[in-house]
């Protein structure tokens, strides 16, 4: 796991070769190809610009599968605070980064048994494919 600026632990950050826009589009394609769905794309920088503020290119993609997430939320209702899964795609001084909360962190936070924690683990391979590692 990599810590972001400001000491945020429990997150994983990977460098993406594409722009923020390209990375978001590719992530949406990969999510769909795996039979999941994108529930929302939150354009933080776009909304900031809309009210006259400046923010580095910053977008959060919420995605998942009701078949995978529902058993987790049924067992641990508070896990709905973190589901669907989220990936932050952001510009870090000209380098696109992809950051998400590590599945192990989520499992520990909510005391998920291994069977349920495994339902969240696909975010690692998905983001590896996204960034080409």
Where are the regions that the model predicts?
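Well-ordered alpha/beta subsegment
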Residues: 109-133
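A generic alpha-helix structural signal
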Residues: 24-28, 73, 120, 124-127
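Beta-strand/loop substructures that line and gate deep hydrophobic ligand-binding cavities in soluble
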Residues: 86-110
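Terminal, regulation- and interaction-focused segments at domain boundaries
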Residues: 2-35
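Compact, glycine-rich, soluble single-domain proteins
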Residues: 30, 39-88
């Amino acid at each position: 796991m990599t810590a972001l600026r400001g000491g945020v632990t429990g997150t994983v950050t990977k460098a993406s070769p594409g722009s923020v826009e390209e990375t978001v589009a590719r992530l949406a394609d990969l999510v769909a190809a795996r039979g999941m769905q994108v529930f929302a794309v939150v354009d933080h920088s776009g909304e900031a610009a809309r009210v006259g503020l400046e923010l580095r290119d910053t977008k959060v993609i919420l995605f998942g599968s009701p078949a995978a997430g529902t058993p987790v939320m049924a067992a641990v209702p508070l896990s709905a605070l973190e589901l669907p899964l989220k990936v932050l795609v952001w510009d870090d001084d000209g380098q696109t980064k992809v950051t998400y909360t590590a599945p192990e962190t989520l499992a520990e936070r909510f005391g998920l048994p291994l069977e349920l924690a495994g339902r969240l683990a696909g975010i690692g391979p998905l983001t590896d494919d996204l960034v080409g590692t």
